[in-house]
Amino acid sequence: VFSFEFMQNAYIAGTFIAIVCGIMGVYVVGRNMSFLSHMLSEIGFSGASFGIFMGWPALNGMLLFTIVSSVLIGRMSVQASRREAAISAISSLFLGLGILFLAISSKNVSYATNILFGSVIGISRQEVWQVLVLTIVALLFIFFMYRSLKFDSFDHIGASVKGIHTNLVSIIFLVVLALSVSTAAQVVGSLLIFVLLTLPASAAKFVSKTVSGMMLFAVIAALIGVWLGLYLGYVTNWPVSFFIATIECAIYFGALLFNKNK
């Protein structure tokens, strides 16, 4: 398997994506933002369409659209009751723009549509370096804001009482989430991002009672899904996304049964 450069690239990129999605997923689940992570991944497709229309690298368009939309959502959804409406409004706007740019672009648009499904087997060494750099940036943000993020995600009222600037923390978190989604979507696809951001972390809630324990389990679960999915995709020539999604679902239901039988 590792004698081929494309598989080496796939495993390296997949490993970093699994790590950042596993860690970010714990906060996504803790903040009840699974729907937002799904919408950001689709907005990434719109950003790729815009980038291609402008003659930019698709990643630049993805970063622009996801970061701007996450900041707008953060500003509009200060109250939790407004969050879903804000997410729906902003995502509808950006998805509409993406479809428009895809329709009027005279350039190669196949890459933009590939963003929906990903092409982890076809990733280049340059894209591996992009994933590596952006993943490190996202993890550094998480590391330096670990205490505030943990407090705000799992005890929002307590964080406000303690004087933590919860609005600022939320916006920074959304920007880091946008960065993570843009990094991973170009490799594993927008549709699979939702799986890696939610299922490992959701399973971790059933087997661990601490945030650090949830992160460890979520990262391991994401790594198992990506590594095993890549191998099975290689030997069967079936879509890697199918195997990763199936494995993560199996881990989730296994954790659910474990929790019920305790």
Q: Which ranges hold each PLM region?
A:
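Small-residue-rich segments of transmembrane alpha-helices in multi-pass membrane proteins
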Residues: 43-53, 90-102, 122, 166-176, ...
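Short loop segments and helix-boundary regions at transmembrane helix junctions
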Residues: 26-108, 204-216, 233-235, 261
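Membrane-interface capping segments at transmembrane-helix boundaries
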Residues: 147-148, 257-262
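Membrane-helix/interface signature in polytopic inner-membrane proteins
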Residues: 140-173
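Transmembrane alpha-helical segments in multi-pass inner-membrane proteins
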Residues: 193-242
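Membrane-interfacial amphipathic/re-entrant helices at transmembrane-helix boundaries
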Residues: 1-19
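Loop-to-transmembrane alpha-helix initiation sites
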Residues: 10-13, 58-66, 84-88, 132, ...
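Transmembrane helix-bundle core of multi-pass membrane transporters
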Residues: 5-9, 80, 87-145
